[in-house]
């Protein structure tokens, strides 16, 4: 008999987030920042330490699939030449994910980004407790703290083995990106048009084409 405690924990954590006014407000602000970056053709950098790093890679790929310049940054390698071309005058957005919000590698990255790209806005998505949140708030390089109020039990049930928190990170990012394209300035048709251009072959191309024909009629 399969034990569904993990699924129940995920649902409970998502519901806690959904029912928290502050968390929902923060996700809305993040969505608006993503929307403005897309409208301004900015590069959106996404990073995370450990397992959230894989969530960051996935969401950078999601942005690319809808013709947005989404780039994953390995925070550990950023200070060793991996930041790529430097455009001091071009605004950009850096979104970092850390459950505690206290990953030192991220703070080093924030410092580099602000030095090399002064117009880059830095966002920290975290599930910090109050003590951890004090450290996040003390960082002057962070422009916006997307604090999510939830207490995931993780795979082990004691908050140790990352699993539930990664689902929360994915939910936050997907909601924010989807919300950006639900806005009047962009719209779902715009997202589908971008998806159509980035998928010139395969079954998805025909599905998107049919959907666009339906939406336009």
Predicted segments, located by residue:
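Short, glycine-rich nucleotide/cofactor-binding loops
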Residues: 15-25, 94-103
């Amino acid at each position: 008999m399969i034990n569904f405690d993990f699924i129940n924990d995920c649902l409970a954590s998502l519901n806690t987030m959904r029912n928290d006014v502050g968390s929902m407000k923060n996700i809305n602000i993040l969505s608006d920042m993503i929307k403005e970056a897309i409208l301004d053709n900015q590069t959106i950098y996404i990073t995370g330490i450990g397992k959230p790093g894989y969530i960051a890679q996935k969401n950078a790929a999601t942005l690319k699939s809808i013709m947005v310049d989404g780039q994953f940054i390995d925070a550990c390698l950023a200070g060793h030449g991996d930041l790529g071309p430097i455009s001091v005058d071009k605004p950009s957005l850096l979104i970092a994910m850390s459950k505690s919000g206290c990953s030192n590698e991220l703070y080093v990255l924030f410092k580099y980004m602000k030095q090399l790209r002064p117009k880059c806005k830095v966002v920290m998505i975290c599930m910090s407790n109050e003590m951890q949140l004090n450290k996040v708030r003390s960082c002057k390089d962070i422009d916006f703290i997307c604090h999510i109020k939830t207490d995931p039990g993780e795979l082990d049930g004691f908050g140790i083995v990352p699993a539930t928190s990664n689902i929360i990170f994915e939910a936050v990012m997907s909601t924010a990106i989807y919300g950006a394209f639900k806005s009047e300035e962009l719209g779902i048709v715009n997202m589908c048009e971008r998806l159509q251009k980035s998928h010139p072959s395969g079954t998805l191309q025909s599905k998107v084409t049919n959907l666009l024909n339906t939406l336009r009629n």
